[in-house]
Regions:
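Short beta-strand-to-loop acidic/aromatic patch adjacent to the donor-nucleotide binding site
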Residues: 78-89
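Short, flexible, basic/aromatic active-site loop/helix in glycosyltransferases
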Residues: 130-167
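Short, well-formed alpha-helical segments that are part of the catalytic scaffolds
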Residues: 11-25
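A short, conserved alpha-helix in the catalytic core of glycosyltransferases
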Residues: 159-162, 168-187, 191-218
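Active-site-adjacent helix/loop segment of glycosyltransferases
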Residues: 203, 207-272
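Conserved donor NDP-sugar-binding/catalytic core segment of glycosyltransferases
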Residues: 89-125
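Glycine-rich, basic loop-to-helix element that forms the pyrophosphate-binding segment
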Residues: 57-76
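A conserved acidic beta->alpha catalytic loop
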Residues: 33-44
């Protein structure tokens, strides 16, 4: 069984309907809409298909919303669970391709496909485990050349994004995960209301299995950096980053260095 979930907060109906269309033309058996909005105006979408379950929830954050669906997926005996952003869409049944990849790579617990902008450009969402300089420097150090160079390293631009590779930190916009791994890790850490929760989850998954990037499958993402435009979102972003480093370590994080070095060596071997 394959389950999937999206968490919404006054999400564009157009985006959500487009995503639902992708889901219903795929091999996803059950799709959960966790609605954190201040009203349940999206409830009517449940009537589109019996494969859709709508859950109206208090807004406890992105990760906590997804945990509701993860618990349901575990109860249903799901084999794979997909975490999807509402502004994601794709062509064809890419889900079967991801299942085949996981079947062929039993040591992989999480896979992310290649994520593209609607115009076909690559989104650089494969990342190393971050240092404080990576996350704060890219935002607050006012030197464009420094930011670009640091980002290119942190976001692994040098990898080419054209080969299968193990990646320490993958984006939460589309995560294809073995449900038993989600059960072992306990899902998202509810302390992260918004931002950094995917980074934390991917890191915890990476401690017990491999987290992989699979560029043969393509997904489109209408990506917007909301915290760059909204002060309230910026506050959430900064708070989550602080919580992340309080949890894992700021400048002294031996596991971070070990994991990054391991993945860098693997990637260098693949490139050569």
């Amino acid at each position: 069984m394959i389950t999937a979930a999206v968490v919404t907060f006054h999400t564009s109906r157009k985006d959500l309907i487009r995503l639902i269309d992708c889901v219903l033309h795929s091999s996803i058996d059950k799709f959960f809409i966790i609605d954190n909005s201040t009203n349940d105006a999206l409830r009517e979408l449940e009537s589109v298909s019996e494969r859709i379950t709508y859950i109206y929830s208090d807004n406890l954050g992105f990760g906590s919303g997804h945990n509701i669906a993860i618990d349901r997926a575990i109860d249903l005996g799901s084999d794979y669970h997909i975490i999807i952003n509402p502004d994601i869409y794709w062509n064809g049944d890419i889900i079967e391709q991801l299942v085949q990849f996981m079947d062929q790579n039993k040591d992989c617990g999480l896979v992310m496909p290649k994520i593209l902008y609607p115009n076909g450009e690559v989104q650089y969402l494969c990342k190393l485990l971050p240092t404080p300089l990576d996350l704060f420097g890219r935002r607050f150090i006012p030197f464009k050349m420094f930011q670009e160079k640091r980002n290119a390293w942190y976001e692994m631009h040098w990898s080419g994004y054209d080969k299968v590779m193990e990646v320490p930190s993958l984006s939460g916009c589309f995560m294809f995960i073995r449900t038993d791994i989600l059960k072992k890790t306990g899902g998202f850490d509810k302390r992260f209301f918004m931002y950094a929760e995917d980074m934390d989850l991917c890191r915890r998954i990476g401690e017990i299995t491999r987290t992989m990037y699979y560029p043969s499958v393509l997904v489109f993402h209408e990506y917007e950096k909301g915290s760059y435009k909204n002060r309230k979102l910026l506050k959430y972003h900064i708070c989550s980053i602080i919580k992340y480093f309080n949890k894992w370590g700021w400048f002294i994080d031996k596991k971070r260095r070990k994991k990054n070095d391991y993945c860098l060596k693997l990637t260098e071997h693949i490139r050569n």
